[in-house]
Amino acid sequence: MATPLGWSKAGSGSVCLALDQLRDVIESQEELIHQLRNVMVLQDENFVSKEEFQAVEKKLVEEKAAHAKTKVLLAKEEEKLQFALGEVEVLSKQLEKEKLAFEKALSSVKSKVLQESSKKDQLITKCNEIESHIIKQEDILNGKENEIKELQQVISQQKQIFRNHMSDFRIQKQQESYMAQVLDQKHKKASGTRQARSHQHPREK
């Protein structure tokens, strides 16, 4: 427990020590008074001189006066102690009340922090899920792009093969046409030679 303002453990201990010392003094004084009374009783039983009796009586009066002062001082110190204890009790209750209010506020703050932390974790998880989904979509897109590139290459190769085939086909056609022309010319030439020979033979007859 925190030490109240205006009051310290050392101060409390000093007051208690002073009260104990006062109680010891009172007990000693009461013991001395008791002894003096016994002396007075003995003086009554055994005759003593007037001077001795007056001296003892004076000392008894002084001790009674000192005893009364000590009791008054003790009462004042006890009153101070009770007042101080009352202040300590009030301050302790106030401190306990403030402690409960602080713990309640701290609990509320912790709860809010946990809620915010939970929201933050949820947002991070959501962002990670979105990022993962985007990465997957990018992978799929890259795969499609690669497929398209491969198809484009295949189409390009097929076009080139087709061009080569068309070129070979044209060459072949040209060659066939050329051969046909050559053969046709040879055929015509051979036919002309035969006709010329057939015209020459009748003349010889």
Curated annotation (Swiss-Prot):
One of its GO terms (biological process) is spermatogenesis. Residues 138-185 are annotated as: Required for interaction with CBX5 and TBPL1. One of its GO terms (cellular component) is cytosol. Pfam families: SPATA24. InterPro entries: SPATA24. One of its GO terms (molecular function) is identical protein binding. Residues 17-166 form a coiled coil. Residues 180-205 are annotated as: Disordered. Residues 186-205 have a biased composition (Basic residues). It is found in: Cytoplasm; Nucleus, Nucleolus; Nucleus, Nucleoplasm. Keywords: Coiled coil, Cytoplasm, Developmental protein, Differentiation, DNA-binding, Nucleus, Spermatogenesis, Transcription, Transcription regulation. Belongs to the SPATA24 family. Homodimer. Interacts with CBX3, CBX5, GMNN, GTF2B, TBPL1 and the polycomb proteins PHCF2, RNF2 and SCMH1 but not with CBX1 or PCGF2. Binds DNA with high affinity but does not bind to TATA boxes. Synergises with GMNN and TBP in activation of TATA box-containing promoters and with GMNN and TBPL1 in activation of the NF1 TATA-less promoter. May play a role in cytoplasm movement and removal during spermiogenesis. This is Spermatogenesis-associated protein 24. The lineage of its organism: Eukaryota, Metazoa, Chordata, Craniata, Vertebrata.
